[in-house]
Amino acid sequence: MLQKTVLLLALVAQVLMLENGLLRTPPMGWLAWERFRCNIDCVEDPKNCISERLFMEMADRLAQDGWRDLGYVYLNIDDCWIGGRDASGRLIPDPKRFPHGIAFLADYAHSLGLKLGIYEDMGKMTCMGYPGTTLDKVELDAETFAEWKVDMLKLDGCFSSSRERAEGYPKMAAALNATGRPIAFSCSWPAYEGGLPPKVNYTEVSRVCNLWRNYKDIQDSWKSVLSILDWFVRHQDVLQPVAGPGHWNDPDMLLIGNFGLSFDESRAQMALWTVLAAPLLMSTDLRTISPQNMDILQNPLMIKINQDPLGIQGRRILKSKSHIEVFKRYLSNQASALVFFSRRTDMPFRFHCSLLELNYPKGRVYEGQNVFTGDIFSGLQTEVNFTVIINPSGVVMWYLYPIKDLGISTMMSHW
């Protein structure tokens, strides 16, 4: 009964959220920060500095290399773009690095079928020391972003108090809506309040934000990925019910294509973020990404699972003594996704299990597909044991759907 209640509450919570009609599925795109940080040296490093050129080149790659057509449509500027404020108090971009302005970049992105995201901070300064959005500047900055035809705002939380954030984030949401332009709102609010109740009221956050950072910034290492995953798992009973169409928990960017993850770890992050219904925001150099990493990020079935219209966040349902964990996500049309994740550090492990042990209903027969290999299997009965072989720090991921009911039970499966 408790397990059924958890699923019911997740569905009810989605209904109670206030909507601006945006991000009915998790956003997909590219974000500058993890890979390019605050590199503003356009003399020594003109190809990689935070500049108009960088974003135009990434826009070209999104449009020409298949990313846009798979759903990766957001081109998101992060910190270090601001040049200051003009005499009327309006934000202006750095004139040397963004000589044509942000509206020019927005028009360029839109001409390629993309959307432009921008960054500010709910505080006196951004995290890297550029002019922030103080409470008296909220409406002005929202109007400026709308005039520039921006499509998403990421609002950070450095250099502000809890009181200022509690007032400022709802105020910005209202100001964005008042512009009449559809601007998705990415909040860092929960992360600056510890990510958990009672300091974080996720009902309120969900009414204000389309997505929100809950925890620490990701760094280019497997240790960082695991720390974020561990936090999400520890608190999944709080986090899972508040996610849904238009409102997403954000465990931060995808590292795939950078320097810190192995091949298996890259596949693991992609699979785990997908089953968590996380935003798929890449932060890598799309000009030099390897075909192997492109294959991970452009996996059509993976993207289909991430973008499932039900929008139910998955959760860990099994932690075995053999250091194998199983994550499950409910999908539309009675389908589901399973991720078998190995915490082992020795060798590939043969994991034996049955769907019955993973809370699938008795008496059903399933067909499925291995998300990474594409192999299709059929005739898997709930009660029959199967074996998956999982590499250390790797995953096996299945997409499953019932093809037959043997008449024993037709009840909906539960967590």
Curated annotation (Swiss-Prot):
- Read off the SUPFAM superfamilies from this record: (Trans)glycosidases, Glycosyl hydrolase domain
Taxonomy, superkingdom: Eukaryota
Keyword Lipoprotein included in the entry's annotation: no
Residues of the signal peptide: 1-17
Name which cysteines form disulfide bonds. Answer: C38-C80, C42-C49, C127-C158, C187-C209
Q: What is its EC number?
A: 3.2.1.49
Subunit text: Homodimer.
List positions binding substrate: D78, D79, K154, S188, R213, D217
Q: Which GO terms describe its biological process?
A: carbohydrate catabolic process; glycolipid catabolic process
Modified positions (Phosphoserine) are S322, S332
According to UniProt, the name of this protein is Alpha-N-acetylgalactosaminidase
Compartments in which it is found: Lysosome
Which Gene Ontology cellular-component terms appear in the entry? Answer: lysosome; membrane
Grouped into one coarse class, the protein's main location is: other
Family assignment? Belongs to the glycosyl hydrolase 27 family.
Keywords attached to this Swiss-Prot or TrEMBL record, sorted alphabetically, are: Disulfide bond, Glycoprotein, Glycosidase, Hydrolase, Lipid metabolism, Lysosome, Phosphoprotein, Signal
